[in-house]
Amino acid sequence: MNERMVDQSMHSEETDFELSLRPTRLRQYIGQNSIKSNLEVFIKAAKLRHEPLDHVLLFGPPGLGKTTLSNIIANEMEVNIRTVSGPSLERPGDLAAILSGLQPGDVLFIDEIHRLSSVVEEVLYPAMEDFFLDIIIGKGDEARSIRIDLPPFTLVGATTRAGSLTGPLRDRFGVHLRLEYYNESDLKEIIIRTAEVLGTGIDEESAIELAKRSRGTPRVANRLLKRVRDFQQVNEDEQIYIETTKHALGLLQVDQHGLDYIDHKMMNCIIKQYNGGPVGLDTIAVTIGEERITIEDVYEPFLIQKGFLERTPRGRKATPLAYEHFAKSNEERG
């Protein structure tokens, strides 16, 4: 799958850029106000008791700040953080090596925790509950169990698929926090802050326009801002103006709802070739040349959230709003 401007997942070249933009304290974190308020209380209470924070599960769509929040938690607790991904923990020994290296109160952040293997997950249970590991060494008749005591720590797990977590793992998290899509006001504030970090001026209209087209996701907002800045610098403008912003977003094929060429391709397929549906997901996948799982996990959620697409027992169906928007878009494109 080609990388899209509106893809909510991180592009390979964006790691350093995102790191430079991440806030380090809760007071700097824009949006997710309910989560911030709760975390402030939980962190303050844990510090008053001189205990590590309860294990935290962060879940929601990609690009909303789960990794950023995990680092903020460590900073607010004044402890170190160790970051790993679920798929990288292939064997119990991988987990044991990391956990045994933690200091009291440290944070272990496991991204994509829903992708932990069942073997590693079972070893994690006593570590989360009672802070010890039971590791089997040797094979057959020579196999023996070794208990490793661990310092109290906080596990922060992040997932885009909370429903894929097993019940026993999910229940061991004391704090469950769902990150929601950002409103346009918060995205506008994020865009203005990012422009300051980049050393680029931006007018308010441009910040509002970018916020509208960012799919409720800071990662998308920052990516679009970077590309619009390219046009501004080539034009040798003193700052980013609305005319440049609209021109750039038009060339990038990101419309006023944050939909791109793939969204248009998929919806036009349903509307034009299959009379608006219902049409099966496999049929759509073959018609537009994309994998079923990519359509289901990447393209569909935002179209459904915006009210353009319905999932029915008989297949996918375009809504009246989709007919209105995509017919108008097709007319504008000629």
From Swiss-Prot:
Tell me what reaction this enzyme catalyses: ATP + H2O = ADP + phosphate + H(+)
Provide the alphabetized UniProt keywords.
ATP-binding, Cytoplasm, DNA damage, DNA recombination, DNA repair, DNA-binding, Hydrolase, Nucleotide-binding
Q: List every stretch annotated Small ATPAse domain (RuvB-S).
A: 183-253
What this chain does, per the entry, is described as: The RuvA-RuvB-RuvC complex processes Holliday junction (HJ) DNA during genetic recombination and DNA repair, while the RuvA-RuvB complex plays an important role in the rescue of blocked DNA replication forks via replication fork reversal (RFR). RuvA specifically binds to HJ cruciform DNA, conferring on it an open structure. The RuvB hexamer acts as an ATP-dependent pump, pulling dsDNA into and through the RuvAB complex. RuvB forms 2 homohexamers on either side of HJ DNA bound by 1 or 2 RuvA tetramers; 4 subunits per hexamer contact DNA at a time.
As recorded in Swiss-Prot or TrEMBL, the protein's gene is named ruvB
UniProt-recorded name of the protein: Holliday junction branch migration complex subunit RuvB
The subunit field of the Swiss-Prot or TrEMBL record says:
Homohexamer. Forms an RuvA(8)-RuvB(12)-Holliday junction (HJ) complex. HJ DNA is sandwiched between 2 RuvA tetramers; dsDNA enters through RuvA and exits via RuvB. An RuvB hexamer assembles on each DNA strand where it exits the tetramer. Each RuvB hexamer is contacted by two RuvA subunits (via domain III) on 2 adjacent RuvB subunits; this complex drives branch migration. In the full resolvosome a probable DNA-RuvA(4)-RuvB(12)-RuvC(2) complex forms which resolves the HJ.
The family line of this record is: Belongs to the RuvB family.
Q: Where is this region: Head domain (RuvB-H)?
A: 256-334
The organism named in the record is Staphylococcus aureus (strain JH9)
Q: Which GO terms describe its molecular function?
A: ATP binding; ATP hydrolysis activity; four-way junction DNA binding; four-way junction helicase activity
GO annotations under biological process? DNA recombination; DNA repair
